[in-house]
From Swiss-Prot:
UniProt-recorded name of the protein: Protein-glutamate methylesterase/protein-glutamine glutaminase
Residue ranges occupied by any CheB-type methylesterase domain in the UniProt entry: 152-344
Organism annotation: Salmonella typhi
Lineage of the species this protein comes from: Bacteria, Pseudomonadati, Pseudomonadota, Gammaproteobacteria, Enterobacterales
Keyword line: Chemotaxis, Cytoplasm, Hydrolase, Phosphoprotein
GO MF: phosphorelay response regulator activity; protein-glutamate methylesterase activity; protein-glutamine glutaminase activity
Entry annotation: catalytic residues: S164, H190, D286
Amino acid sequence: MSKIRVLSVDDSALMRQIMTEIINSHSDMEMVATAPDPLVARDLIKKFNPDVLTLDVEMPRMDGLDFLEKLMRLRPMPVVMVSSLTGKGSEVTLRALELGAIDFVTKPQLGIREGMLAYSEMIAEKVRTAARARIAAHKPMAAPTTLKAGPLLSSEKLIAIGASTGGTEAIRHVLQPLPLSSPAVIITQHMPPGFTRSFAERLNKLCQISVKEAEDGELVLPGHAYIAPGDKHMELARSGANYQIKIHDGPPVNRHRPSVDVLFHSVAKHAGRNAVGVILTGMGNDGAAGMLAMYQAGAWTIAQNEASCVVFGMPREAINMGGVSEVVDLSQVSQQMLAKISAGQAIRI
């Protein structure tokens, strides 16, 4: 099998050296070239035709976003962004994902060499995932039309969503059409700390429903969406007649914190047939067992189809485990989940 050919673009000579060490330390990939800025990278892309590009967000001559926008328009290819762990860095990274980047890695704030080398396996996994990703599925999406509100729903009704690679844009596509009368939506998206708050704030500006980073102990309200905070598990709990959010520091599940399985298992336990579960694009199997538990508890469960996924890992695993009621294109997910929950069809006969 041929190696994954990687090109790294970063204005830091140290970062270029570190990325080269990381990539070349894995037998299934190789660094074919590095570039100090996008203008040099443009020529190297033509020369080496890499499978994956790693791209620094902030660079001289042309910043990473401008370059990414041109690249995805003229020569679409898998891109993994390299971002700083700052408020501004998270906003720029989310914009990069919107423009078509597959994923991102964050630079440690201290001890760059030691920190990046510690991330070696994670970086390699993201590069492998990017090399297999569907670029055509990751074109920026137009804002969808708002769906018509169904009948007033009981506060018992609930939608739970899980996603990973490619999920930020998929979640946006699912939430934007939801009317204010929608049931509560609770979401686990694999993301590091700091990024989930920026992600929630970005969605809140784009959606009719309110979107926020979830907080421990808050009540779950209709017309609101709650994003699990980075590096924390989120679970659904009961507080009398109401649903409540629990945030905790439990060990990683399926190597993830937050974990979709943790959320889905809690929804199966506390919401049962009053819930609709949705599993979107993502690598790995997180959420598959939890979705089966939701299905067995009477929930209607939806998996995104392969054609519209950036990475069809998590939905495939959920389908293979037998916990999926229906498989639909991303463009139909919002409509289907509202139709099922509004018609009371979260309950399977």
